[in-house]
Swiss-Prot record:
<dbReference type="GO" id="GO:0097216">
    <property type="term" value="F:guanosine tetraphosphate binding"/>
</dbReference>
<dbReference type="InterPro" id="IPR032090">
    <property type="entry name" value="RF3_C"/>
</dbReference>
<keyword id="KW-0648">Protein biosynthesis</keyword>
<dbReference type="InterPro" id="IPR009000">
    <property type="entry name" value="Transl_B-barrel_sf"/>
</dbReference>
<dbReference type="GO" id="GO:0016149">
    <property type="term" value="F:translation release factor activity, codon specific"/>
</dbReference>
<feature type="domain" description="tr-type G">
    <location>
        <begin position="9"/>
        <end position="277"/>
    </location>
</feature>
<keyword id="KW-0963">Cytoplasm</keyword>
<dbReference type="InterPro" id="IPR031157">
    <property type="entry name" value="G_TR_CS"/>
</dbReference>
<keyword id="KW-0342">GTP-binding</keyword>
<dbReference type="InterPro" id="IPR038467">
    <property type="entry name" value="RF3_dom_3_sf"/>
</dbReference>
<dbReference type="InterPro" id="IPR053905">
    <property type="entry name" value="EF-G-like_DII"/>
</dbReference>
<feature type="binding site">
    <location>
        <begin position="140"/>
        <end position="143"/>
    </location>
    <ligand>
        <name>GTP</name>
    </ligand>
</feature>
<dbReference type="InterPro" id="IPR000795">
    <property type="entry name" value="T_Tr_GTP-bd_dom"/>
</dbReference>
<dbReference type="GO" id="GO:0005829">
    <property type="term" value="C:cytosol"/>
</dbReference>
<protein>
    <recommendedName>
        <fullName>Peptide chain release factor 3</fullName>
    </recommendedName>
</protein>
<dbReference type="InterPro" id="IPR005225">
    <property type="entry name" value="Small_GTP-bd"/>
</dbReference>
<dbReference type="InterPro" id="IPR004548">
    <property type="entry name" value="PrfC"/>
</dbReference>
Length: 526
C-alpha cells in the first residue's frame, strides 16, 4: 500500500445533519472533545458565558446561539482522521448546507428522542439521497423523557425510507435512563451524568446474562433481557454494504450533553464509514488514488478573520496530494497559481497546512478570483459536477444610510454574496442593488455583517420581484431580441450571468410562453 493509499484509507469526511435544536452543535463539540481537538466543550446555549461552541465562531452566531455558516474541523480517533463539516442548523441556510453535502463521503443524522423525524431532517435526507450518501444515526437526549425507541425507528424507516439497524439500545429514558446495551459487543454501558466537560470512562458490564447486571439494575435486568430478545427478532441486522450503499442506517442512542454514547458512535464511524470515494467530473470519473491533485471549491467565507478582511475558499481535495508551494491550475480562468499558504481549520483557529490528502478540506486565500464550484487540478481540464445555486424566493432592495459608503457597500455585498447564502442582482435599467435569499434570516445576517465587518449601515426596502430565473439561449440573435424587449426585468447576478426578475408567478409563466426559445432555469450549476 502506497503512502497516498494509506492516507486515503484513514480519512473520514462527513457532515452532521439535523433539525434545529436536536443537539447537533453539542454533538459536534463532544466529537471534538473525544477526538482530542478541544479540551473543554463550550455549551451552545450559554450565550452570555465566556465559552462558546467551537463551531459557532462568527459574531452573530455567538450572539444568537445558532449555526449560520459551515465550519470545518479536523480531529483524530483510532488512527483515523476525521474531517467534520458542521452545517447551519437554521432552515434559511439550506443552500450552504446543500453545497456542504456535496463535499462529504457520509453523514451523521441527529434526532431528538422526544421529537423524532422533523421537517428539516426530511429535506436534508432528500439531498443525501441524490448521491446515496451513507447515513449513520444518533438518537439524542435520552436523559430526557422521549418517545419509545421502537416507535422512533419505525418513524425513521417509514418517513425517510431507509432501513434501521440498531447497534445500541437504550435502557429506560429520562430520570429512569440507565445506559445502553451494545447489541454487537454484548455489553451494557451504564449511564453517568456527571461529566459534561470531561471524559470519564463509565462502568461497563460484559454480557447480558452477567449476575452483576442483576445486582446493579434489579428487576430492570430481566425486563432488558426480554426487550433485547424482541429487538433482535424484529429489527434489521447491521449490513455494512447496505449502509455504504445508503440503504440502511446503523442507529445509536445516547445523550450528547452528558458525553454518553459518543465513544461507541465514534468507534463505529471509524470502522464502517467510507473513506474518500471517486468523484464524477464532466469529463470522467476521478479516483482518489490518482497521482495528480484535483479538488473543488464548495464554499467561500468572507472575513473569517475580521482583522485581516480575508476571503477563504474551502476546497475539498478529491485526488492526489497537496504539498506546500505546489503549482495548481485554476480551470475556469485557465491560469496557474502557486499555493504556498493554504490553511487547515479548527472552526476559527487556523494553521498553515504542509500537506493534504483526498477527503481533507483546505482553505485557499481568495482575492476575488475564486468562485464556488471552481475546480483546481495540476493541468488537466476537469470540472467537478453537482454544486448547485438555487433561485431565491425573497428579494429586497438595499438602501445605504450614508451615500459616501457606496463603494464599501458594493464590496461588502459582492464578497458576502460570494459565500452563497444571499445572491446579489444588479438590474440593467438602474443602479439598484437587489439581494435575493431563501429565508428572512439571511437578510438579517447580511445587514449585521455589513455593519460589523464593513462598517456599512443599510436598510431594506420592498421590491416588486417574486422570483428569479437564469436565462440562456442557443441563438444569440434571439437572446439579443429578448434582452431588448424585456430589458426592464433583466439583471446580472454577482458572477455576471443574465437573470430574469419576475414580478409575479403569472408574469414568469407569460414570459416563458412568449419566449419558447429562451431557457429559464431555477438552478444554476456552479
Amino acid at each position: 500500500m502506497s503512502e497516498l493509499e494509506f492516507e486515503i484509507e484513514r480519512r473520514r469526511t462527513f457532515a452532521i445533519i439535523s433539525h434545529p435544536d436536536a443537539g447537533k452543535t453539542t454533538l459536534t463539540e463532544k466529537l471534538l472533545l473525544f477526538g482530542g481537538a478541544i479540551q473543554l466543550a463550550g455549551s451552545v446555549k450559554g450565550r452570555k458565558a465566556t465559552r462558546h461552541a467551537t463551531s459557532d465562531w462568527m459574531e452573530m452566531e455567538k450572539q444568537r446561539g445558532i449555526s449560520v455558516t459551515t465550519s470545518v474541523m479536523q480531529f483524530q480517533h483510532r488512527d483515523r482522521i476525521f474531517n467534520l463539516l458542521d452545517t447551519p442548523g437554521h432552515e434559511d441556510f439550506s443552500e450552504d448546507t446543500y453545497r456542504t453535502l456535496t463535499a462529504v463521503d457520509s453523514a451523521l443524522m441527529v434526532i431528538d428522542s422526544a421529537k423524532g423525524v422533523e421537517e428539516r431532517t426530511i429535506k436534508l435526507m432528500e439531498v443525501c439521497r441524490l448521491r446515496d450518501t451513507p447515513i449513520l444515526t444518533f438518537i439524542n437526549k435520552l436523559d430526557r423523557e422521549g418517545r419509545e425507541p421502537v416507535e422512533l425507528l419505525d418513524e425513521v424507516e417509514r418517513v425517510l425510507n431507509i432501513q434501521c439497524a440498531p447497534i445500541t439500545w437504550p435502557i429506560g429514558m429520562g430520570k429512569r435512563f440507565k445506559g445502553v446495551y451494545h447489541l454487537y459487543e454484548d455489553a451494557i454501558h451504564l449511564f453517568s451524568a456527571s461529566h459534561g466537560d470531561r471524559i470519564v470512562k463509565g462502568e461497563v458490564v460484559e454480557g447480558l446474562n452477567s449476575p452483576k447486571l442483576d445486582e446493579l439494575l434489579g428487576d430492570i435486568a430481566d425486563e432488558l433481557r426480554m426487550e433485547i430478545e424482541l429487538v433482535r427478532g424484529a429489527s434489521h441486522e447491521f449490513d455494512p454494504d447496505a449502509y455504504r450503499a445508503g440503504r440502511q442506517t446503523p442507529v445509536f442512542f445516547g445523550s450528547a450533553i452528558n458525553n454518553f454514547g459518543i465513544l461507541e458512535l465514534l468507534d463505529a464511524f471509524a470502522e464502517y464509514a467510507p473513506p474518500p470515494q471517486a468523484r464524477q467530473a464532466r469529463e470522467r470519473l476521478v479516483a482518489p488514488g490518482e497521482d495528480k491533485f484535483s479538488g473543488f471549491v464548495f464554499k467561500i467565507q468572507a472575513n473569517m478573520d475580521p482583522a485581516h478582511r480575508d476571503r477563504i475558499a474551502f476546497l475539498r481535495v478529491c485526488s492526489g496530494r497537496y504539498t506546500k508551494g505546489v503549482r495548481l491550475f485554476h480551470v475556469r480562468s485557465g491560469k496557474a497559481m502557486q499555493v504556498a499558504n493554504a490553511i487547515t481549520f479548527q472552526a476559527d483557529s487556523r494553521e498553515n497546512v504542509e500537506e493534504a490528502y483526498p477527503g481533507d478540506i483546505i482553505g485557499l486565500h481568495n482575492h476575488g478570483t475564486i468562485q464556488v464550484g471552481d475546480t483546481f487540478t495540476q493541468g488537466e481540464n476537469l470540472k467537478f459536477e453537482g454544486i448547485p445555486s438555487f433561485a431565491p424566493e425573497l428579494f429586497r432592495r438595499v438602501v445605504l444610510k450614508d451615500p459616501l459608503r457606496s463603494k464599501a457597500l458594493q464590496r461588502g455585498l459582492q464578497q458576502l454574496s460570494e459565500e452563497g447564502a444571499t445572491q446579489l442582482f444588479k438590474p440593467l435599467r438602474n443602479n439598484d442593488l437587489i439581494l435575493g435569499a431563501v429565508g428572512v434570516l439571511q437578510f438579517d445576517v447580511t445587514a449585521f455583517r455589513l455593519k460589523a465587518e464593513y462598517n456599512v449601515d443599510c436598510v431594506y426596502e420592498a421590491v416588486p420581484v417574486t422570483t428569479a430565473r437564469w436565462v440562456s439561449c442557443s441563438d444569440p440573435k434571439k437572446l439579443e431580441e429578448f434582452k431588448r424587449k424585456v430589458h426592464d426585468n433583466l439583471a446580472e447576478d454577482g458572477s455576471g450571468y443574465l437573470v430574469y426578475l419576475a414580478t409575479s408567478r403569472v408574469n414568469l409563466s407569460l414570459t416563458e410562453e412568449r419566449w419558447p426559445e429562451i431557457r429559464f432555469s431555477a438552478t444554476r450549476e456552479l
